[in-house]
Regions:
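Sequence context of c-type cytochrome heme-c attachment sites
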Residues: 46-58, 63, 198-199, 481-488, ...
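The canonical Cys-X-X-Cys-His
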Residues: 537, 543-552, 602, 687, ...
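Electrostatic cytochrome c docking/interface patches
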Residues: 518-542, 556-557, 586, 672-679, ...
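Electron-transfer interface patches adjacent to heme c in soluble/periplasmic c-type cytochromes
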Residues: 499, 504, 548, 562-683
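Post-cleavage N-terminal segment of exported redox proteins
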Residues: 460-470, 474-530, 651, 658-665, ...
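Short, membrane-exposed interhelical loops at transmembrane-helix boundaries
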Residues: 334-335, 409-434, 482, 654, ...
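Hydrophobic cores of alpha-helical transmembrane segments in multi-pass integral membrane proteins
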Residues: 14-45, 49-116, 127-148, 160-185, ...
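Cytosolic juxtamembrane amphipathic/interface segments immediately preceding
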Residues: 2-15, 297, 477-488
Length: 707
C-alpha cells in the first residue's frame, strides 16, 4: 500500500503553549494577590478595579480558560494529529481558533475588573463575549471533526473519545446557561430566575469542571502518560467502561452544589446519588492511568515528567473521591460555604490540571525543538517545590474550613450560639489565609522555574514548524465483525451522536420538571419585584462581586436560623435574575440582613468596615459615595426583566425613576437624621436600599446580635 507524505502542524501547538505559560503565570499572580487580600485587605491598593470581589473571577477565568484552556488546546492539537495520522483539517481554522480564544481572554481581563459581570461562577462574562465564545468553540469543533473525518487511522483512540465528549458537552452547557436578555452592550439579566437559575448554573458549573477540566485532560493523560512511560494503556476494556459511565453519570451530579438550599429535595437527592456513583468510573480512570506505569515505576524516581504525571493522576483520584464524599449531606453540612471547598478545588486544579500540564510541556517542548530538556535537575526541583506548594496551600484551607464550620454550629451550655459574632469565626482562621498565600507563592515559583527551563530548552534546539510524517491512506472498505466498541470507533458521526444523547439525558430529567411543575417552586404572595432603586442597588452588588464573599441562602439548620433568621424559601427568589446564593461565606449570609441594621450602619460599614465590625477583612468602598447611579438605564432594566417574566406593569418604565427618586430621598433623609450627608443619586443609597430589602418579603425571626 502506497504511503502518503504529510506534515504535522507544530506551529499552532507552539502558539497555544506560549499562551499557556504566559497566562498561567498571570493567573497565578492574580491568585496570590487575592489570597493576600484575605489577610491584608489593603493589598487592593485602594482601587475599585482590584478588590477581591472583582478580581476573584478574573483569577478563576484566567486559570480555567486561559491557562488550562490553552494547555488543553495545545495537547489536543498535538496528540490528535498524531493519533489520526493527518494534519489538522484547516490551518485557517486552527489560527482563527487561537487568536479568537486569546481575544476572548483579553476581553475577560478588561471587563471583569471593570465590574462587567453576570455574577454566575465560571460564566461571569457578559453576552457579547458569550457569543464570541460560541463562535470560537464551533470553529474548534469543525476543525476537530473535520480532522477526524480525514484521518488515516481507522480506529479512534480513547483520547479522541474524550476530546469529542468535551466539544459536544461544553457546547451544550454554554448555550443553555448563557440564555440572557441584554439591557446594554455590557449588561444583561439571566433568562432564568431563582431556583431554576441556580439549578442551571450548577448543572453548568459542575459540568464545566467535568468537561473542561477533566475529560480533555483524561484524553491528554491517555496519550502522554503511555508515551512518557513507553508503555501501552493498561486496559482497553477499562477505558471503554471509564468513558461511557463517566460522561453519563457526571452530568447528573450538579445539584450536589445546592444541598440544603431551596432546590427541591428530589433534585438534591439525584445529585447526591449520582455523585456517589461517580467514584467508580473516576477511580477506573485513575487506576487505568497508574497501572499503565507497570514495569516503569523504577523510572519515576529519576524522570520528572513521570513524577508530575503520577501525582496528577493521584490528585485526580483524590479529588474525585472527595467530591462524592462532599455530596453526602452530613459532610456537605460541614464543608459547604467554607474553605474546605477551596482546598478541594485547588487539589484538583493545582494537582491534576497543573501537574499534568507541566508534565505535558516538559515532554512536548524538547521534541518540537529537536533537543533534550535543558535541566532535568531543575525540573525535579520544580516538582518538589510545586508539591510542597500544594500541601502548604491545601492543609491550612482544610483546617480553616473545619474549624470555622464547627464554630458556626457550636452552642454553649445555655443553648445559645457560642460565637454569635460571625467575625469571631473569621479572625481565628486569618493565619491560615496567610499560609495559603505562601503555598500559592511556592507553586508560582515552580512555574517560573519551568518557564526558564523551557525557554533554555527551546534556545538550545531548533523549532520544527512542520514535522514530516507518512502513513497509508484510509481505505474505504466495509469491515465486518469485531468488538462492538471497535465498530463504533470507526463511525465518528454515530459516536458523537451517542455522546450527545448520553449527556442530555441527565440534564433534561433534572431541569424539565423544575421548570414545568409549579409545585417545585411554591409561590409566596408577599414576594414582590424589586423597586427601581433596589434594582440598581442589586446591580451594584453584582458589579462589586459581593456574592463572592456573601451567600444569600439561610439553610434549615438551627445554627443558621438562630444566627440569621428564618430559613430561605424557594418562592422568595422568583424575581431574582440572576440568583445570588453564593458558594462561599468569607462574610456572613445576607439573605435576612434587611431591617437588621439601620441605614447609617450600612453607610459607615461600606465606608469603613472596621468602624462597625472591628477585625473585618472586608475592604472599604469609597467610590460608592462619589459615583452616581445611571437613571437612564432604569427603563431598559425594567423592560428586560418584564421580558423574562417579572410582573412590572406595562408602561411602568416611564415612571420608574419617579419611584426611584422618592425612595432615595427617604433614605437620604434618614441618613441626614443620623448626621450623614449624601447625594440621593449616590450608588451607596441604591446599595443600602437593596440590602434593606433582603429577606423582608416574609416575616423574619429574631437573629443573633452583633453579627
Amino acid at each position: 500500500m502506497e504511503l502518503q507524505q504529510f506534515k504535522y502542524d507544530n506551529k499552532i501547538v507552539k502558539y497555544f503553549i506560549i499562551a499557556t505559560v504566559i497566562f498561567g503565570l498571570v493567573g497565578m499572580l492574580v491568585g496570590i494577590l487575592i489570597a493576600t487580600q484575605l489577610f491584608l485587605p489593603e493589598a487592593n491598593f485602594g482601587l475599585q478595579y482590584t478588590t477581591f470581589g472583582r478580581i476573584r473571577p478574573l483569577h478563576t477565568n484566567a486559570i480555567i480558560f486561559a491557562f488550562v484552556g490553552n494547555a488543553m488546546f495545545a495537547g489536543v492539537y498535538y496528540s490528535m494529529q498524531r493519533l489520526l495520522k493527518t494534519r489538522m483539517f484547516s490551518d485557517f481554522l486552527s489560527y482563527l481558533h487561537f487568536w479568537g480564544w486569546q481575544l476572548i481572554i483579553l476581553a475577560a481581563a478588561i471587563t471583569l475588573p471593570l465590574g462587567l459581570t453576570t455574577s454566575k461562577e465560571y460564566a461571569e462574562l457578559e453576552w457579547p463575549i458569550d457569543i464570541a465564545i460560541t463562535i470560537i468553540w464551533v470553529v474548534f469543533g469543525i476543525n476537530m471533526i473535520g480532522t477526524i473525518i480525514k484521518r488515516r487511522e481507522r480506529h479512534m483512540y480513547v483520547a479522541i473519545w474524550f476530546y469529542i465528549a468535551t466539544f459536544v458537552t461544553v457546547a451544550v452547557l454554554h448555550l443553555v446557561n448563557s440564555f440572557e436578555i441584554p439591557v446594554t452592550m455590557f449588561k444583561s439579566y439571566s433568562w432564568y430566575a431563582g431556583v431554576q437559575d441556580a439549578l442551571v448554573q450548577w448543572w453548568y458549573g459542575h459540568n464545566a469542571v467535568a468537561f473542561f477540566l477533566t475529560t480533555p485532560f483524561l484524553g491528554i493523560m491517555y496519550y502522554f502518560l503511555p508515551k512518557a512511560a513507553n508503555r501501552p494503556v493498561y486496559s482497553y476494556k477499562l477505558s471503554i467502561i471509564h468513558f461511557w459511565s463517566l460522561i453519563f453519570i457526571y452530568i447528573w451530579a450538579g445539584p450536589h452544589h445546592l444541598l440544603y438550599t431551596s432546590l427541591p429535595n428530589w433534585a438534591q437527592s439525584l445529585g447526591t446519588v449520582f455523585s456517589i456513583m461517580l467514584i467508580a468510573p473516576s477511580w477506573g480512570g485513575m487506576l487505568n492511568g497508574l497501572l499503565t506505569l507497570r514495569g516503569a515505576w523504577d523510572r519515576v524516581r529519576e524522570d520528572p515528567i513521570l513524577k508530575f504525571m503520577v501525582v496528577a493522576v493521584t490528585a485526580y483520584g483524590m479529588s474525585t473521591l472527595e467530591g462524592p464524599l462532599l455530596s453526602i449531606k452530613s459532610v456537605n453540612a460541614i464543608a459547604h460555604y467554607t474553605d474546605w471547598i477551596i482546598a478541594h478545588v485547588h487539589v484538583g486544579g493545582l494537582g491534576w490540571n497543573g501537574f499534568l500540564i507541566f508534565g505535558m510541556l516538559y515532554w512536548i517542548i524538547p521534541r518540537m525543538w529537536g533537543t533534550k530538556l535543558y535541566s532535568t535537575k531543575l525540573a525535579n526541583v520544580h516538582f518538589w517545590i510545586g508539591t510542597l506548594g500544594i500541601i502548604v496551600y491545601a492543609l491550612p484551607m482544610y483546617t480553616a474550613g473545619v474549624v470555622q464550620s464547627l464554630m458556626w454550629k457550636n452552642f454553649n451550655a445555655d443553648g445559645f450560639l457560642e460565637y454569635p459574632n460571625f467575625l469571631e469565626t473569621v479572625t481565628q482562621i486569618v493565619p491560615m489565609y496567610a499560609m495559603r498565600a505562601v503555598g500559592g507563592l511556592l507553586y508560582f515559583s515552580g512555574a517560573v522555574m519551568m518557564s526558564y527551563n523551557l525557554i533554555k530548552t527551546a534556545k538550545q534546539g531548533s523549532f520544527i514548524p512542520s514535522e514530516a510524517a507518512e502513513a497509508p491512506a484510509l481505505e474505504k472498505r466495509k469491515i465486518m465483525g469485531g468488538h462492538w466498541h471497535s465498530v463504533l470507533e470507526r463511525k465518528p458521526v454515530i459516536f458523537t451522536s451517542l455522546v450527545l444523547v448520553a449527556i442530555l439525558i441527565g440534564g433534561v430529567i433534572e431541569m424539565v420538571p423544575t421548570f414545568l411543575i409549579k409545585s417545585n417552586i411554591p409561590t409566596i404572595a408577599s414576594v414582590k419585584p424589586y423597586t427601581p432603586l433596589e434594582l440598581h442597588g442589586r446591580d451594584i452588588y453584582i458589579r462589586e462581586g459581593c456574592n463572592n464573599c456573601h451567600s444569600q441562602m439561610v439553610r434549615p439548620f438551627r445554627s443558621e436560623t438562630e444566627r440569621y433568621g428564618e430559613y430561605s424559601k424557594a418562592g422568595e427568589f422568583v424575581y431574582d435574575h440572576p440568583f445570588l446564593w453564593g458558594s462561599k461565606r468569607t462574610g456572613p449570609d445576607l439573605h435576612r440582613v434587611g431591617a437588621k441594621y439601620n441605614n447609617v450602619w450600612h453607610f459607615n460599614h461600606m465606608l469603613d468596615p472596621n468602624s462597625t465590625s472591628p477585625g473585618s477583612i472586608m475592604p472599604p468602598y469609597p467610590w460608592l459615595f462619589t459615583q452616581g447611579i445611571d437613571t437612564k438605564l432604569t427603563a431598559g432594566k425594567i423592560k428586560a426583566l418584564r421580558t423574562v417574566g417579572v410582573p412590572y406593569a406595562e408602561g411602568y418604565e416611564d415612571i420608574a425613576n419617579q419611584d426611584l427618586k422618592a425612595q432615595a430621598q427617604e433614605i437620604v433623609n434618614d441618613l441626614k437624621a443620623g448626621d450623614v450627608e449624601i447625594s440621593e443619586g449616590a450608588e451607596i443609597v441604591a446599595l443600602i436600599a437593596y440590602l434593606q430589602r433582603l429577606g423582608t418579603d416574609i416575616k423574619v425571626q429574631p437573629t443573633a446580635q452583633n453579627q
